[in-house]
Design a protein with these regions (language model features):
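Extracellular/periplasmic, surface-exposed regions of secreted and cell-surface proteins
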Residues: 1-233
Length: 233
């Protein structure tokens, strides 16, 4: 069973002035939650094959027992962005976002992300007016820092496993299964992109070329540790 919600609030302002200037300013607020839980029962000994309700079973399967899992992820973010166009020739945009997620360590849950880009419509320049066969010639470039969450909900918390087969005075025991990591932080990727767009002969011929590079920092991966550490990974 799962339940989730994603709420967003957007404020925006745009204006054209002096016939050549276009400005857009936006502010976005977002909050989301994903909650899920599941239970598993393995039983046997039903009186008839068409009676499958759990309470009608005779017993649990051999070495079987009820199992279950649950997860809760929460995320919040605020984004501001500005776009500017001059005379439909020059473009610029800037965005900044502060993001927070519950999966990370208590001291690393929030992180900033940002991007900026520029563009140039060369075919709009006066020196291109006599090039009649060319409909579009645009150069663009951008840089961005993005983040991702690619692990379980409780990866940064200390986890315990219960002993259910052995008891002491009717009480369960437990042992530490995973260490807490309050410094578990966002995996960030630096992205560079440079592009060229060409349209010719009434846009019968179109060419788009991109050169890009992505570099990920603080890459998260699973490691298997020696048993002498007391933890498998």
């Amino acid at each position: 069973k799962s339940f989730s919600y994603d709420w967003s609030l957007t404020l925006s302002y745009s204006r054209n002035f002096k016939e050549k200037h276009e400005l857009y300013v936006g502010l976005d607020y977002n909050v989301a939650q994903e909650k899920s839980h599941s239970y598993t029962f393995q039983v046997e000994g039903f009186p008839q094959s068409n009676i499958k309700f759990l309470s009608m079973a005779l017993q649990y399967q051999k070495d079987g027992k009820p199992t279950g899992s649950e997860s809760l992820n929460r995320r919040i973010g605020v984004t501001g962005n500005v776009n500017y166009i001059y005379d439909n020739r020059y473009f610029a945009d800037v965005a900044y976002r502060m993001d927070g997620a519950s999966q990370f360590g208590s001291s690393k849950r929030f992180a900033p992300f940002y991007s900026f880009g520029i563009g140039w419509n060369i075919h709009k320049e006066k020196f291109m007016e006599n090039v009649l066969w060319l409909d579009r010639l645009k150069l663009r470039g951008s840089y961005a820092v993005t983040g991702s969450v690619n692990f379980d909900a409780y990866q940064a918390l200390a986890t315990y496993e219960y002993y259910t087969d052995d008891r002491y005075r009717y009480w369960f025991g437990s042992h530490l299964q995973g260490l807490a990591n309050e410094d578990l932080e966002w995996q960030k990727t630096d992205k560079w992109n440079f592009g060229l767009e060409v349209g010719a002969f009434h846009n019968r011929l179109k060419v788009t070329a991109d050169v890009y590079t992505n570099q990920t920092n603080n890459l998260l991966s699973e490691m298997y540790l020696p048993l002498t550490n007391g933890f498998p990974s």
